Regions:
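Short acidic low-complexity segments
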Residues: 168-185, 206-207
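NAD(P)-binding Rossmann-fold cofactor-contacting core
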Residues: 144-164
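Glycine-rich adenosine-cofactor-binding loop
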Residues: 8, 101, 111-112, 116, ...
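Residues in the short beta-alpha loop(s) of Rossmann-like NAD(P)-binding domains
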Residues: 10, 152-154, 219-221
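Rossmann-fold NAD(P) dinucleotide-binding segment
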Residues: 75, 195-215
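Phosphate/diphosphate ligand-binding glycine-rich loop within oxidoreductases
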Residues: 2-114, 222, 229
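Short glycine-/small-residue-rich Rossmann-like dinucleotide-binding loops
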Residues: 65, 189-193, 219-220
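Rossmann-fold NAD(P)-binding glycine/threonine-rich loop
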Residues: 211-259, 263-265
Length: 271
């Protein structure tokens, strides 16, 4: 029986095992999918070594906080993973680890399903980790007009700007400045656990007076404090979660097998 994992920390609240259990049952696939808690980089390395040696583990999803850290442990990447240095899916093939970024595809489906046109839009992105890099690349490729990054980590923020600023001359990318008036902006939250800690609420206070067009929270597990903000529309990450999983399924089984699944039914049952 084929085995698949999702690894990260914390991992107990992940809905991925329930999602894939339903998928495998629906498609009559004999496979198991389970969550594995990885507490540190040393454990991550051990897990990857186990994957290389195992005859049963076919692939795994990678979640916070290891989407970037895993990149040094695998053998090759897809193009999006190379650009973003963010990997959320691996496939084991002949003892080699292949890395993929399916979050990009998931976000692309999210904006399509919710009829969002990012061309010429102004956007504030919260966070500067692997997920933020993925979303920012998507904004750039969709010809967004402005991207302002709001993050506590100035080093990773500066690196994003350095890496991406030359990709599209139509897109301006910069550090958020609370002395500037932001009007007609979207807000995209790419932080891992929402804005619940005191340090993260300090970030929220910097945008409290902005009237947002659309708020997109790519999380699907956490209830954030965005209801206290002003916005016309809010979208959470269930669509992105499901479609990145569909992409993982297609990669692992080397086919468009996800086309057989009823997305709306899955969203109703799992999310």
């Amino acid at each position: 029986m084929k085995k698949f994992k999702v690894v990260g920390f914390p991992i107990s609240q992940s809905k991925s095992p329930a999602l894939f259990k339903y998928i495998f049952k629906s498609l009559e696939i004999k496979a198991e999918y389970s969550a594995k808690e990885i507490r540190n980089s040393s454990d991550l390395k051990k897990f990857i070594n186990q994957c290389r040696q195992s005859k049963y583990i076919e692939g795994s999803n990678i979640t916070m906080p290891y989407k970037e850290k895993i990149s040094s442990l695998i053998d090759c990447y897809d193009n999006i993973a190379k650009l973003t240095n963010s990997i959320n899916c691996i496939k084991i093939n002949d003892n080699k680890i292949l890395g993929y970024n399916n979050d990009y595809y998931g976000f692309e489906k999210l904006i399509a399903i919710n009829n969002i046109n990012l061309k010429n839009t102004n956007n504030i992105v919260l966070g500067s980790g692997g997920s933020a890099r993925t979303i920012i690349l998507n904004l750039i490729n969709n010809n967004a007009k402005n991207i302002s990054i709001l993050s506590r980590n100035k080093k990773t923020t500066s690196k994003i700007i350095k890496d991406f600023k030359q990709l599209n001359e139509k897109t301006s990318i910069n550090i958020f400045n609370n002395k500037i008036s932001y009007e007609n902006y979207n807000l995209i939250n790419c932080t891992p656990i929402g804005l619940k800690k005191d340090t993260e609420k300090n970030i929220l206070s910097q945008i409290a007076l902005i009237n947002f067009d659309t708020i997109i929270d790519i999380n699907y597990l956490y209830k954030n404090d965005f209801l206290n903000l002003c916005y016309k529309k809010i979208i959470t990450g269930e669509d992105m979660f499901i479609f990145q999983a569909f992409k993982s399924l297609d990669i692992w089984f080397e086919s468009k097998i996800s086309n057989k699944l009823d997305y709306k039914k899955i969203k109703e049952l799992i999310c």
